[in-house]
Amino acid sequence: MKFLPVMRRGLARGLAGLLLLASLPGFARADGQAAVWALKGTRNTVYLAGSVHALPKDRAQFPPQLELAYDASDAIVMEVDLDDLNPLEAVQFLTERGTLPASQTLEDVIGAEKYSTVIALANSIDLPEMAISRLEPWAAAMVLTQFALMRTGFDPQLGIDMQLSDRARSDGKPIDGLETVGEQLGIFDSRSMSEQTKFLLDAARDVPEMQKDLDRLIVAWRAGDLRALEREFRKERAQSPALYDELLGTRNRKWLPKIEALLNEDRNYLVVVGTLHFVGRDGLLALLAKSGHKPVMLPGTPVSATN
């Protein structure tokens, strides 16, 4: 990786979106349906769409249901307002919060044996040791994952979020965010060093299978296959339960009242967040259903509040 250029392009506009990720028989797939739902408001419709934050060039096209939802919407809401995002905001956050004190190195923090494992994986994808040797474990994991992602041909610039942001800007549709980059990255920065170290080691060990994992996610996303997405969620959560509960469940609960407030507006909205935010007992679909709302998959039937 040319470290700073990728940080600016991929991290500043795509890294925050990489925060990708209970039984769900009531949320089963219907063939040909994408991960797009509609919620009827008092005077409007709020569309919900699961995003894949990075896509390869040959699979970057929108599913028809997402095209329909975008065309019918007057404004877009994303995890972070990419339209107003300062390109250096994520880089600045990493510099200020993700860099170790001058007296420490990553090897000092995680130990020589674990550091050797991480560097071996970094070397396998041609990531220079100097790119992560002075970072806190969580930040090193982000850089390692971002670089591995780019090496597979998955480009954050082609992710659904980025494409929608660019299109909305061109079409003059307002864009808003559910949270800030600092809030997103702060979830990782607030973890203990032991938790961060585990997160880094998990990220490093995932590198060899990243291509296969992403391919499975895209297939499930395009099909609206929530059972397959649920399997991906369980796999991710098993590695770091507390972290993923905060990444998904806690954030979903914070977003819920903001999404519900949109149902009282006069214009239609398209809310776009990572696809894994919709699955599980603390997923947005379950939370909305429990609040009395009836998300309807396009085309499809209402989601039940019970399994």
What is the role of each PLM region?
Residues 2-15:
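Bacterial N-terminal signal peptides that target proteins for export
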Residues 14-22:
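Sec-dependent N-terminal signal peptides
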Residues 24-31:
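Sec/Tat signal peptide C-region and signal peptidase I cleavage site
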Residues 31-247:
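Structured, acidic catalytic/metal-binding patches in enzyme active sites
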Residues 245-307:
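C-terminal soluble interaction/assembly domains
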